[in-house]
């Protein structure tokens, strides 16, 4: 048995389950494993150079012929170049962490790609719907990384109401990890679920085993939403570094951000000019202070230290609240099959209540 939803029909995937484009986590191995398991895997390109993204796409295509996606920073200076790369390589889905410009949406749709931005409010849902988005991901406050204050149980129905009548599939994110959640999301009216932390904690994830163990040790109160990482609300595991950031001075955090800006420039091969240009775009788009723009350089380097280098003391571990309830490391195939079968069981049980 399978679940057929507007999402599975739109993209041509077997199951309405999406693996989100987590920086430093969603590489070729995880994405291809998700795709081969019947879900939608999304490559995280924000922490890749253009050449690295091209190489990652090639790796995915070498081991799967199933649809997959690429997540792009809509405010990046080279967003257009990344879109053109996706089009040349025939990538099925373009995912955006911010609302992309109308021109980018039009270019992708002209090429036959499916455009799926992530949004955090009903007003944003209405905007991207009017601009021609094919679907959207809505993440509630339970989700990891940059997040908002509204729980999925309230944000999801508000977004569904905002786009009612448009036929645009809405994908629920934030707090999902099993079949019960998928069944609940479908009952709300969503077309599927997107998960980050749950896919990070699989055997197909390249995150170091020691870091995975640190996630599995977390309790339900083991995450915190902090603004000390990059100036914006960021849900992360409560680690020693995070506690220091929370209790330390802002001046010290600002100085650390300046050092990390230099490290990120060298790692990404970006010029100071392009970083400043991206900063100007970011500041205008989100109405941030210059301090917050500079602090944003903390994010990629601190996440890399934890998720790639395995240094949980010097790095930051973005995490959804679901980390506190997870206790296993299944393969993507095992995970998706279990979620779908469990969801079908719960939907059948619920339907039996109706007389």
Curated annotation (Swiss-Prot):
Record CDD domains: NPD_like
Keywords tagged on the record: Cholesterol metabolism, Flavoprotein, FMN, Lipid metabolism, NAD, Nucleotide-binding, Oxidoreductase, Steroid metabolism, Sterol metabolism
GO terms classed as biological process: cholesterol catabolic process
Protein residues bound to FMN: 21-23, 173-175, 196-197
UniProt xrefs under Gene3D superfamilies: Aldolase class I
Molecular function as annotated in GO: nitronate monooxygenase activity; nucleotide binding
EC number per UniProt: 1.3.1.-
Enzyme class name: oxidoreductase
Stated regulation of activity: Requires the presence of IpdF.
Pathway(s) this gene product operates in, as recorded in its UniProt entry: Steroid metabolism; cholesterol degradation
InterPro entries: Aldolase_TIM, NMO
Gene Ontology cellular-component annotations: plasma membrane
Keyword Magnesium applies: no
SUPFAM superfamilies (alphabetical): Inosine monophosphate dehydrogenase (IMPDH) (SSF51412)
Stated name of the protein: (3aS,4S,5R,7aS)-5-hydroxy-7a-methyl-1-oxo-octahydro-1H-indene-4-carboxyl-CoA dehydrogenase
Naturally occurring in which organism (per UniProt): Mycobacterium tuberculosis (strain ATCC 25618 / H37Rv)
Gene name of the encoded protein: ipdC
């Amino acid at each position: 048995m399978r679940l057929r939803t507007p999402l599975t029909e739109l993209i041509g995937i077997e199951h309405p389950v999406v693996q989100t484009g987590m920086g430093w986590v969603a590489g070729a191995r995880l994405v291809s494993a998700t795709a081969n398991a019947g879900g939608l895997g999304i490559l995280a390109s924000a922490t890749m150079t253009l050449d690295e993204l091209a190489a990652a796409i090639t790796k995915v295509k070498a081991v799967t012929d199933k649809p997959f996606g690429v997540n792009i920073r809509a405010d990046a200076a080279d967003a257009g170049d990344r879109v053109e790369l996706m089009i040349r390589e025939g990538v099925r889905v373009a995912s955006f962490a911010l609302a992309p410009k109308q021109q980018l949406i039009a270019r992708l749709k002209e090429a036959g790609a499916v455009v799926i931005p992530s949004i955090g409010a009903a007003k944003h849902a209405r905007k991207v719907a009017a601009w021609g988005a094919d679907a959207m991901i809505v993440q509630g406050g339970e989700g990891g990384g940059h997040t908002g204050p509204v729980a999925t149980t309230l944000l999801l129905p508000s977004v569904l109401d905002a786009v009612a009548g448009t036929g645009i599939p809405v994908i629920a994110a934030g707090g999902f990890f099993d079949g019960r959640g998928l069944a609940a999301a479908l009952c709300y009216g969503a077309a599927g679920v997107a998960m980050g932390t749950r896919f990070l904690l699989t055997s197909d994830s390249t995150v170091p085993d020691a870091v995975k163990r640190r996630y599995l040790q977390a309790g339900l109160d083991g995450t915190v939403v902090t603004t000390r990482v990059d100036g914006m609300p960021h849900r992360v595991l409560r680690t020693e570094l995070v506690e220091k950031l929370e209790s330390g001075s802002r001046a010290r955090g600002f100085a650390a951000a300046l050092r990390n800006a230099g490290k990120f420039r060298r790692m990404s091969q970006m010029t100071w000019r392009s970083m400043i240009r991206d900063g100007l775009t970011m500041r205008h788009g989100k109405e941030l202070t210059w301090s917050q723009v500079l602090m944003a350089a903390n994010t990629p380097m601190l996440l890399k230290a934890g998720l790639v280098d395995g240094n949980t003391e010097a790095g930051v571990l973005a995490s959804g609240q679901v980390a506190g309830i997870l206790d296993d490391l299944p393969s993507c195939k095992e995970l998706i099959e279990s979620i779908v079968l469990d969801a079908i069981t719960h939907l059948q049980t619920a339907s039996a209540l109706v007389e």
